[in-house]
UniProtKB/Swiss-Prot annotation:
UniProt GO BP: cellular response to epidermal growth factor stimulus; epidermal growth factor receptor signaling pathway; positive regulation of cell division; positive regulation of cell population proliferation; positive regulation of ERK1 and ERK2 cascade
Tree of life domain: Eukaryota
Organism the protein comes from: Xenopus laevis (African clawed frog)
Its biological purpose: Adapter protein that may provide a link between cell surface epidermal growth factor receptor and the MAPK/ERK signaling pathway. May promote cell proliferation.
Keyword Transcription recorded: no
Protein name listed in UniProt: GRB2-associated and regulator of MAPK protein
Family per record: Belongs to the GAREM family.
Gene responsible for this protein: garem1
Annotated keywords: Mitogen, Phosphoprotein
Source taxonomy: Eukaryota, Metazoa, Chordata, Craniata, Vertebrata
Length: 876
């Protein structure tokens, strides 16, 4: 006998009220809630109204304005979903009037006009033999390949040395051949070739195009030119043209019963920009009717209260939710509701910002030195939708934010997320969109496939061995089982604040965005640069970059430094801050799955919570360094000494340079206290917790360096010339021996943090380890310098003395640092050389004037360094 469904009047509600983002991230949907505080701006809602929270969805819409003749914008802004089924025809664009389309037949013509950007209209291949130098006979063939549609942002001009072909000197060869001196005077002919330096956005690489290169270029994309004819969907227009763009409605559009703005035949619109936002779709359960509505995820009002039975975990709550869910499913089509055309609500303008954009790694880690290129990217909205948004271009994707946050305001992984709560339907309803993916996704080749599958195929991540994404058709198969979710996933009571300390996971592994690597031709051009490139036109940060939420403002720091006046833009290293492609791949493999509004990773085991037993961790303990290519970022995970891959090193180029804004050119390193009783709290010998309550946000370099330094004597295989990878997450069995948290007292920018005492056993052990290191290397270096500079003087790390080679031109940046320490130069000099990325090739070209005026070296230091470059070596 079935029990009758309880009435909403019989539900007892809790006294506490919470905003939507807390509810959605804490409980699986659907759920019943009651309005506690409706606020003034929420139409159709009153206090004590009951709502069914249906689902959390990501909507991608195009903001548009109505147009009058003459391209005047009128009326309110509207939002057109990317899946809108109507067709549009492109009009004459405003930019076509202001900047008529130009066509060029060679690079030289492009350089004379020097527009902001050009597009390649046909495939171009060009070969040039580049000479290594005036006195060097080495040459290298530089192959240029440009594909149709490549977008090139112009950056400047320069000259490179090239090897003349035999035809150019054939007459001279004939003369010398007659007099028998061809072999003695047959040196390679060289000439200077002017080049146009561009950024190719397809390859994300800077290239040098010789003026001699022939080919068709245009200031309009060939795709955009093709789009001028015919009718196109809004998605097609956004992907292939550069917004803003003017369109007209050539034929009667389809109708949607949920449309709040009616698009009619003959209307004109200006597509302004793209917006991706996360909304919560709800149903207001009035006594006489049910009204669908939606809210942006981060509205402060309305606030809602939960049923007490949900907190207690009573089973009958399942039947109430299922009853109203079935009614809403029968009466309303959520997919159609999500694709409706609406007016933009002015009161939600600030609140509707996409959580994905606010927390996107690609947007929050753009160095100022590359902002000119990113500025061009963000102004081109078709690339914004395809490349920068990545898998964000969803017209109607359901998102599951459950398990990210508790109702006390702290992020946590709930017991409901353990494997025992996962079943075939349950896992299928998880829509987690990785925040760490920076891959450039290509245009879909098979439009007949479901749109969500196309965009998530490359970046799909698996959790618990099951796919996290699926098509809409697959999602519908599980709708009939949705009623079992509340009882299965909403039965556990909220964790207490004390228990939250054991469940925190603050790991954020966000690799920096890909930056253009230095091509071989540019390397050659930089060595003998006759005319330095014109500096970028836009040195300001890109304006369209979304604002960073308050929680991330202290974490994200844009770092840059002005290049030395005598070094070119490329030699100064501003172009080479990012990570290589292979490291990007490895980092994306290791990066945890995350969803907004939290960043959390899968639990290795459901009992990981019991591993961490102490700490005063807070949300303020988020590290400032978000660019480790693996999982360790200083979160509340166990750190095992044995897990450190001591025999593996990362190159210096794997990590961006860490410089805080406003620091002088010469580093003034902060001190790191390894002595005294204030260094570490009581820990076991093998492992310790890395929860750092007293560590400032800017101390991540020092914290990670301290780990490497303390463990340096455990493995002689670890080369001190490059940092060891940070520790990986512990296995469940390794976390049982954790004791009190580690506290690292540091001085960062003059700010002194609290010092905790430590156990005598650990102190004695640590002192002996420290003393052994000091006996071997005799000099301690401050840890505020970058990791690759923490090198022992005159040592390779395996005990053998560092011996610089006779030819210094082939040294890497790390080896140049070793060489400078080898001849006894101070640490601030070494750090300045590293910050300028001086390798051996640049080192041997430094003159006395550059060293004294630009590098600010003393006369003695200049003399010693020049003698060292010329072959002098100190006696060991």
């Amino acid at each position: 006998m079935e029990l009758p469904v309880p009435s909403l009047k019989d539900v007892k509600w809790s006294s506490a009220s919470f905003p939507l983002d807390l509810l959605v991230s804490s409980y699986r949907l659907p759920q019943l809630v009651r309005v506690d505080c409706a606020g003034e701006n929420v139409e159709g809602l009153r206090e004590n109204d009951c709502l069914l929270i249906h689902s959390c969805r990501q909507w991608t819409t195009i903001t548009a304005h109505s147009l009058e003749e003459g391209h005047y914008v009128i009326g309110p802004k509207i939002e057109i979903p990317v899946h809108y089924g109507g067709q549009f025809k492109l009009l004459e664009q405003d930019r076509d009037i202001k900047e008529p389309v130009q066509y060029f037949n060679s690079v030289e013509e492009v350089a004379k006009a020097f527009p902001e950007r050009v597009y390649v209209m046909e495939e171009i291949t060009f070969n040039v033999k580049v000479a290594s130098g005036e006195c060097n006979e080495d040459t290298e063939v530089y192959n240029i390949t440009l594909c149709t549609g490549d977008e090139l942002t112009l950056m400047g001009q320069a000259e490179i040395l090239y090897a003349k072909t035999s035809k150019e000197k054939s007459r001279l060869n004939t003369i010398f051949k007659k007099i028998g001196k061809l072999n003695s005077i047959s040196k390679l002919g060289k000439g200077k070739m002017p080049c146009l330096i561009c950024m190719n956005h397809r390859t994300n690489e800077s290239i040098s195009l010789p003026f001699q290169c022939k080919g068709r270029f245009s200031t309009r994309s060939p795709l955009e030119i093709q789009m001028q004819e015919g009718e196109h969907t809004i998605r097609n227009i956004v992907e292939k043209t550069r917004l803003p763009v003017n369109v007209t409605v050539p034929s009667p559009p389809p109708r949607n019963s949920y449309d709040l703005h009616f698009i009619r035949e003959g209307h004109r619109y200006k597509f302004v920009n793209i917006q991706t936002k996360t909304v919560v779709v709800c149903f207001a359960l009035h006594t006489n009717k049910i009204v669908p509505m939606h809210f942006p995820l981060h509205l402060s009002v309305p606030k809602f209260s939960l049923p007490e039975n949900l907190i207690k975990g009573e089973v009958w709550q399942d039947s109430v939710v299922q009853h109203w869910y079935n009614i809403c499913q029968e009466q309303f089509d959520i997919e159609e509701y999500s694709r409706a055309v609406r007016d933009v609500k002015a009161d939600w303008s600030e609140e509707c910002k996409s959580p994905k954009k606010n927390w996107s790694a690609g947007h929050s880690h753009i160095p100022n030195s590359l902002s000119y290129a990113r500025d061009e990217l963000t102004q081109s909205f078709h690339r914004l939708s395809v490349c920068v948004y990545g898998n964000n271009l969803h017209g109607n994707s359901e998102v599951n934010l459950h398990g990210c946050r508790d109702l006390c305001g702290d992020w946590a992984a709930f017991p409901q997320d353990s494997p025992q709560y996962q079943d075939s339907c349950d896992s299928g309803s998880d829509y987690l969109f990785s925040e760490t993916s920076e891959e450039l996704t290509s245009l879909p080749a098979k439009p007949e496939l479901p749109y969500e599958e196309l965009w998530l195929e490359q970046g799909s991540v698996k959790r618990s061995g099951q796919p996290l994404t699926r098509s809409q058709s697959e999602k519908n198969k599980c709708d009939s089982f949705r009623g079992s979710l509340p009882s299965r996933c909403g039965t556990s009571s909220l964790p207490s604040p004390g228990a939250l300390l054991t469940t925190k996971s603050l790991d954020v592994s966000l690799p920096p965005p890909p930056v253009p690597p230095k091509s071989e031709a540019v390397k050659e051009e930089c060595r003998l640069l006759n005319a330095p490139p014109v500096p970028p036109r836009s040195s300001k940060p890109s304006s369209p970059t979304p604002s960073v939420p308050p929680a991330a403002e202290n974490i994200v720091r844009q770092q840059t430094r002005s290049p030395s006046p005598t070094l070119s833009y490329y030699s100064s290293g501003l172009h080479s801050i990012g990570i290589t492609e292979s490291e990007t791949t490895s980092s994306s493999d290791n990066s945890q799955v995350s969803c907004y509004p939290c960043n959390w990773m899968k639990n290795e085991s459901s009992d990981l919570e019991s591993n961490l037993t102490c700490g005063s961790a807070s949300s303020e303990a988020l590290p400032s360094r978000l660019s480790w290519p693996n999982r360790y970022c200083g979160g509340a995970e166990g750190l095992n000494v044995n897990d450190l891959p001591m025999d593996q090193c990362r190159s210096y180029y794997s990590y961006p340079r860490q410089k805080t804004p406003g620091t002088p050119k010469k580093n003034s390193p902060a001190t790191f206290d390894f002595g005294g009783c204030g260094s570490f709290t009581g820990c076991n010998q093998g492992e310790f917790s890395d929860t750092v309550p007293g560590c400032p946000k800017s101390a991540s370099y020092s914290l990670e360096s301290a780990t490497d330094r303390m463990l340096g004597d455990n493995s002689t295989k670890q080369s001190l010339s490059c940092p060891a990878l940070p520790p990986r997450a512990p296995k469940p069995s390794e976390g049982n021996a954790l004791s009190e948290p580690l506290s690292l007292p540091m001085k960062i920018d003059g700010a002194e943090e609290e010092i905790q005492t430590c156990s005598p056993d650990f102190l004695e052990e640590h002192y002996l380890a420290k003393k052994g290191v000091q006996d071997i290397f005799s000099i301690s270096y401050p840890f505020s310098s970058p990791l690759h500079m923490q090198l022992a003087p005159r040592s390779c790390g395996d005990g053998s003395p560092w011996q610089p080679p006779t030819d210094l031109s082939g040294l890497s940046v790390e080896e140049v640092s070793k060489s400078l320490r080898f001849i006894g130069l101070s640490e601030d000099v070494v750090s300045f050389f590293v910050s300028e990325k001086i390798d051996g090739n640049l080192l041997v070209q430094l003159t006395e004037e550059i060293l004294s005026e630009d590098f600010k070296l003393s006369k003695l230091q200049v003399k010693k360094l020049l003698q060292f470059i010329n072959g002098w070596r100190p006696k060991m």
